[in-house]
Amino acid sequence: MKKVLIAINFDEGLFNFRKELIEALIAAPYEVHIALPDGEYISRLKQMGCIFHETAFRRRGKNPLEECRLIARYNRILKEVRPDVVLTYTIKPNLYMGMLCGIRRIPYVTTITGLGTAVEGTGLLQKLTQMMYRMAMRKASVAFFQNTANEKFFADKGIAPGRHRMLPGSGVNLEHFSYQEFPAEGPAEFLFISRVMKEKGIEQYLDAAEAVRKRYPDTVFRILGFLEDDFEGTERFQRMVEQGIVRFEGSVEDVVPYIRNSQCTVHPSFYPEGMSNVCLESAACGRAVITTDRAGCRETVRDGETGFLVKERDSADLTEKIMRFLEMPTGEREQMGRQGRAYMESCFDRRIVVKHYLDAVVQLTAQQ
């Protein structure tokens, strides 16, 4: 049986966004190996049929010794597994596993799930990462991108020319994220679903919550996600939670019940996204989305039809769009969500994404 190795940085992301791909690969059939740090979703991935290779590393770590250990671990896994095709996601697997696959002449497919702060910019770290990407993707068979801005960035840098392909993000599972009836009764509720960190726009969300509740005091602003250790606004955040201005639920396994009770998802991110899964999932459930007018976010919304686009890092603009939504009749808010669901069905069905990957893997293994 042919072997496919998937290298990624986070078990929750692999399970939540690529479970359907794994199911399709196993059914094909391929022997599926996964290399990533241990976590609570690993047992479920094993139950699906994946063979787990623990690969401990810190996603944001910059210790050279730790990075060398990771490269050595990846090399041992390649020796042990002898995969026919490797799929890589996120920066460190893309860079290190990509370079090793190129050296070992193993076909590999790289996915750019967003530039990330280590790539976007002009600093020394960004220049080094871009240089490493050029080396890592030199022999990539396919380079998948989730938005045109990211693809253009790599094209302008001359990275993996001629092998770029576009995907509608990770897509969205339209069965799990099914349409949810609109909550016509009770106070309007807004939802922020993300890691609590500056780049995800939490400060703008807090600013908007304060401003909106002065005019509409019954409005609910809820937050789902874990609090990043290095978030500098922790003191203000905790104070606003204690005052009841926002409601913090922490990290939850299933966001659907929270989306069901909300009227709109707010995602004011200025993080270099590939394609915002938060926006896709919320729209699939039939909820309006307010998000930033930047790559990875703007593609998920038809401005004024399925939600609103706002300027990056602009609390006043975000507040104005939330106010505009609140001043719409209930029927128009509901219709905005229904149109979002239709948009997801036509353009972002995860089955589209799975087919792209499966076609690439089948083609590469057939050539061997």
Task: Describe the residue ranges of each PLM region.
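Acidic donor-binding loop of glycosyltransferase active sites
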Residues: 260-274, 287
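Conserved acidic donor-binding segment of nucleotide-sugar-dependent glycosyltransferases
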Residues: 302-304, 308-315, 324-330
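Nucleotide-activated donor-binding/catalytic signature segment of Leloir-type glycosyltransferases, i.e.
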Residues: 234-252
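Short hydrophobic beta-strand element within catalytic cores of glycosyltransferases
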Residues: 288-291, 301
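Glycosyltransferase donor-sugar binding loop
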Residues: 36-40, 172, 193, 220-233
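A short, well-ordered alpha-helix in the C-terminal region of glycosyltransferases
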Residues: 218, 317, 324, 331-347, ...
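Donor nucleotide-sugar binding/catalytic pocket of nucleotide-sugar-dependent glycosyltransferases
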Residues: 134-179
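Conserved donor-binding/catalytic core segment of Leloir-type glycosyltransferases
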Residues: 181-200, 206-209, 222
